[in-house]
Amino acid sequence: MKTGKIIKVSGPLVVAEGMDEANIYDVCKVGEKGLIGEIIEMRGDKASIQVYEETSGIGPGDPVVTTGEPLSVELGPGLIESMFDGIQRPLDAFMEAAKSSFLTRGVSVPSLNREKKWDFKPTAKVGDEVKSGDVIGTVQETPVVEQRIMIPIGIEGKIKEINAGSFTVTETIAIVETEKGDREVQLMQKWPVRKGRPYSAKINPVEPMLTGQRVIDTFFPVAKGGAAAIPGPFGAGKTVTQHQIAKWGDAEIVVYVGCGERGNEMTDVVNEFPELIDPKTGESLMKRTVLIANTSNMPVAAREASIYTGITIAEYFRDMGYAVSIMADSTSRWAEALREMSGRLEEMPGDEGYPAYLGSRLADYYERAGKVECLGNDGRIGSITAIGAVSPPGGDISEPVSQSTLRIVKVFWGLDAQLAYQRHFPTINWLTSYSLYADTIDKWMNGNVAENWGALRLEAMTILQDEAQLQEIVRLVGIDALSEKDRLKLDVAKSIREDYLQQNGFHEIDTYTSLKKQYKMLSLILGYRKEAERALEAGVYLNDILAMEDLKDRIARSKYIHEDDLEKMDQIVVDLKNAIDNLINKGGVANA
């Protein structure tokens, strides 16, 4: 290990000389306390080091020791239910080692527990030919997650020895005989965070990641293996939307990265997730979640690492064949960390002071999402769905981070502060949002939910767009200028907005809606429109139709019908048809 000497300190950036044997992205121990840093630039024998801890008290002349290894994460049993900081230090073990509730500098703790023993059940046997990515056994980490122990990348050969039993993450579970000699395999493996884990092939994502949020699943779906952005001004509900997706999304593993946001938001996750029950497994949501907390009061430089740490952990579970979702809240704070380091490196600034390479760094992150055929001989399919919040100052999405993100992702959930002020949640604006997966997912929905799903979705979306145009006419000349058919359209649009798109995240039934229930709800609202138009054509006055308040109230309350009682909606359809038939038979005398 080569020792250099500090010649300059500028906030989280340290410049050291005598580092000619070091490589870019090597991890260094900086100063007498051995603070963790990473080389981000080399000029001759001078290395610019990004330090992931507070640098006060460090000065020129202090030593810098390079470890010769890139910043890597430990991957193995013990990840699920854990909470790490941006460079994968477990916060509970860190607190015990530091004997403090706050981050103390220079404390070194292993990422995975070295004492805990895990029950390993081999699925391979002595004499089997194995290569990178092959599963050789399993560890039941939580009641929900089974870790599939894989041959590390770069090892290929014949199993010489494999043992069942209880092991710590560093004990040898198998020995593989390779051309270059015997290689030991442990439960744990390391991987550099800035390098994507390899796979056999990338697959086109066609299956939706269901979230139980009606506005997302129906109008702006994201595919398993897709990428989505949630931009919005402060208070519009970015974090709440991400929490809802983390809670109810049908991913098997959730990696939640709190990057530069308030600590209270991570506290909410830690408090809520253990108490919430996953509808699919009946277990606590925490049993499938990995948390990475790099809040706004933690060192800025570690924000940059936290997103890479999160995506590398997600890739590890993807390689086991799991559907993983990663939430990054917020990529804007990560970009601000890039901007700060770029400024300290005295690089030429790009738009609004962000570095010129902002777009490519964002692309590097989002491109690690996707649906893939994993390495190994069993043809496992895994996916990572990346959902990134963007916090543009003042809600202005013309700023560089939002624009760079929108060029990369295929789903845009635009949050609207106006909807938040109206207490309409989720605050996804149906006129500005889009999903480029919608047509592909419509085919899946038509085959798996109902044949006319795509047609219903298109009809509802058209009504909402027509409503925006009709509202302008109403504001100019009043509602009396509209025909009865247009006034009916406004009434149906209001029903779609308030009874379908609006969803109460704190109501035990309304917080999650299955696809079957979504289909029945949308069919009910659009069925009301069809029946009302039939009555108008038969000469019934619109006021008589709008006066059916009891039925309209039942349609509005259909969102609170339990998933086990969906036949009640069929009864509403029958009652609606009978009520319209009665109006037509009576001749519809208006109350005008």
Swiss-Prot record:
Record CDD domains: ATP-synt_V_A-type_alpha_C, ATP-synt_V_A-type_alpha_N, V_A-ATPase_A
GO cellular component, as recorded: proton-transporting ATP synthase complex
Family the entry assigns: Belongs to the ATPase alpha/beta chains family.
Keywords from the UniProt entry: ATP synthesis, ATP-binding, Hydrogen ion transport, Ion transport, Nucleotide-binding, Translocase, Transport
Protein's job: Produces ATP from ADP in the presence of a proton gradient across the membrane. The V-type alpha chain is a catalytic subunit.
Protein name according to UniProt: V-type ATP synthase alpha chain
Record-listed ATP binding positions: 232-239
InterPro entries xref list: ATP-synt_VA_C, ATP-synth_a_Xtn, ATP_synth_asu-like_sf, ATPase_F1/V1/A1_a/bsu_N, ATPase_F1/V1/A1_a/bsu_N_sf, ATPase_F1/V1/A1_a/bsu_nucl-bd, ATPase_F1/V1_b/a_C, P-loop_NTPase
Reactions catalysed, as given in the entry: ATP + H2O + 4 H(+)(in) = ADP + phosphate + 5 H(+)(out)
HAMAP family: ATP_synth_A_arch
Pfam families: ATP-synt_ab, ATP-synt_ab_N, ATP-synt_ab_Xtn, ATP-synt_VA_C
Enzyme Commission no: 7.1.2.2
GO biological process: proton motive force-driven plasma membrane ATP synthesis
UniProt-recorded Gene Ontology molecular function terms: ATP binding; proton-transporting ATP synthase activity, rotational mechanism; proton-transporting ATPase activity, rotational mechanism
